[in-house]
Amino acid sequence: MKISVLASDLSDNATGRADLLARLLSSRYEVDVVGPQFGEGLWAPSRDGPVAYRSVRAGRDPGFARHVPELLALVDGEILVASKPRPTSFGLGLLARARRRRPLVLDIDDWEVGFFYRSGAWGRVGRALNLANPNGLPWTWLAEKLICRADAITVASRFLERRFGGTLLPHVRDTEAWDPARYDRADARARQGVGASKVVMFLGTPRGHKGVDDLIDAVGLLGPGVVLALVGVDPARSGAPRWSGLSHVRMTGEIPFDDVPRYLVAADVVAVPQRETMDTVGQVPAKLFDAMALARPIVSTSVSMIPEILDGCGLVVEPGDVPALAGAIKRLLDNTEEAAALGQRARERCEARYSFRVARATLFPLLERLTARSR
């Protein structure tokens, strides 16, 4: 049986969750990921991986509609899994199901409408009038109103579960493949040119709500001998030129997802300093689970589900509190035994709750029930 995973834009980091869903499903089903590509090329971390992608190059303008028939022709699975309640993924799924009846699962890993609230009242007015963007506020709001049309819903956080219902399916990692014993820490440190310095690492797309500026300031308070490695930074992004000029910051560009362990094992501490905003209220950073799988000591913030996930296996501080963030990082850098114990407990938690095995035990029965009902 084939499953089509529908992604909203294969050129940006929204591809990450679609890629994860495809990897989870591929042990039992034939799977590919289908979606529009609004930018240049497939999102870099997903290139050259095991997931099959089929895309249509499109623009964020009224002309997008003419590409819909091309996209629908690619949606040939017996089951449809739409990643995110956006018009260009879930909306496409609704159209595909209308053409040929088949189960449609909607996976929600962010509160998409919440992203538009960060701009304030006048910003929302401007975005509400932007009818040209197929994933703009008016159409995303409409897609959210149609969530009840899905045959099943999976959600990545408690906030999303309360708001939309459905089955909790957090971000997970392949803890068998991501065994820290398989990766050479000395080689990882040499690759990033950190010498004998202690390494605090942030891995991922460094957007404002992810607290990267807070982290840069916090590590700057720790003095010489500690460097901040930012891995996955597009050098053209806002902020990147300024960060690269700081003596305590090392920057690495976007890397393939399957290379993440080869970089992350270099970290003495992994920091996930989410800010508390409308962007993050429903979000759980996927990179948290990278660090957990690889037994890295973690410092994060009390946003969304993070305190629940890291309870007893990581340090959590208030969001936006730079001195507290610096203090928690320093504590782990100075107390290596505590750091190692927390890292090991984080891996054990990941294996028990946030592994491919656990996610498949949730996802596969859900799909089996749907296909049984549709026969």
Language-model features: locations:
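Conserved donor-binding/catalytic core segment of Leloir-type glycosyltransferases
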Residues: 4-6, 193-210, 216-220, 229
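Glycosyltransferase donor-sugar binding loop
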Residues: 36-39, 173, 203, 227-240
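Carbohydrate-associated surface elements
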Residues: 159, 172
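Acidic anion/phosphate-binding donor-loop and adjacent secondary structure
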Residues: 173-191, 239-241, 373
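A short, well-ordered alpha-helix in the C-terminal region of glycosyltransferases
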Residues: 190, 331, 338-353
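Nucleotide-sugar-dependent
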Residues: 210, 256-263, 268-292, 300-308
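Nucleotide-activated donor-binding/catalytic signature segment of Leloir-type glycosyltransferases, i.e.
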Residues: 238-264
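Conserved acidic donor-binding segment of nucleotide-sugar-dependent glycosyltransferases
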Residues: 312-322, 331-337
